[in-house]
């Protein structure tokens, strides 16, 4: 489960790094909503073959935040949450009661130069459009070593919803960003 949580962080944070290789050929006026939700399926290859999949949800309020919740199969209880804002990232491991909070500046050394919140928003909004790319691989977002990992987005909605910043109780302990980096390096 820890591998899933940390892989999701990498996939989400680096999703803004995907290069755009297609030109807009349509001149249709598409109204973009300030709100977007979808279900998601994260599939991670196993080290010894096979793969592991976990479902979840994605909520986005344009120019404000993206929240991704990974849900335990069958019980549908949240096991992890990733919250991305223009200023930073919060990763919450609900199973082990710990979290990492990193600012954009702290993440600069880990991320490609063009990793921006606005790029993540664009990828998610584009996926919600008819004919949009709804399955993203590690290669698509600039991480060739995670080529077989996939995030599938589906059942999009642009209905308005309420979303508040994630608040954590004293039961959760903060772990340093370096601990997260070590875990990611071991995983990759």
Task: For every predicted segment, state its role.
Residues 1-4:
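Positively charged n-region of N-terminal signal peptides that target proteins for export
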Residues 13-16:
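C-terminal motif of bacterial Sec signal peptides marking the signal peptidase cleavage site
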Residues 18-21:
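Bacterial signal peptide processing site
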Residues 23-36, 112:
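N-terminal helix-cap/turn-to-beta initiation motif at the start of protein domains
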Residues 32-35, 59-66, 83-88, 133-142, ...:
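Short, solvent-exposed coil/turn segments at beta-strand boundaries
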Residues 65-115:
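An acidic-aromatic
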Residues 132-188:
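Non-transmembrane domains of secretory- and envelope-associated proteins
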């Amino acid at each position: 489960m820890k591998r899933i949580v940390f892989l999701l962080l990498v996939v989400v944070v680096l999703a803004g790094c995907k290069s755009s290789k297609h030109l807009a050929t349509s001149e249709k006026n598409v109204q973009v909503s300030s709100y977007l939700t979808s279900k998601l399926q994260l599939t991670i290859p196993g080290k010894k073959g096979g793969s592991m999949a976990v479902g979840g949800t994605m909520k986005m309020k344009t120019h404000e935040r993206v929240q991704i919740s990974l849900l335990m199969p069958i019980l549908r209880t949240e096991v992890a949450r990733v919250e991305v804002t223009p200023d930073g990232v919060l990763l919450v491991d609900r199973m082990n009661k710990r979290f990492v909070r990193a600012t954009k500046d702290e993440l600069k050394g880990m991320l490609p130069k063009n990793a921006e919140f606005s790029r993540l928003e664009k990828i998610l909004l584009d996926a919600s459009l008819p004919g949009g790319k709804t399955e993203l691989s590690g290669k698509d977002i600039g991480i060739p070593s995670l080529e077989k990992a996939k995030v599938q987005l589906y059942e999009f909605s642009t209905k308005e919803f309420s979303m508040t910043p994630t608040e954590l109780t004293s039961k959760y302990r903060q772990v340093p960003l370096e601990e997260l980096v070590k875990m990611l390096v071991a995983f990759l």
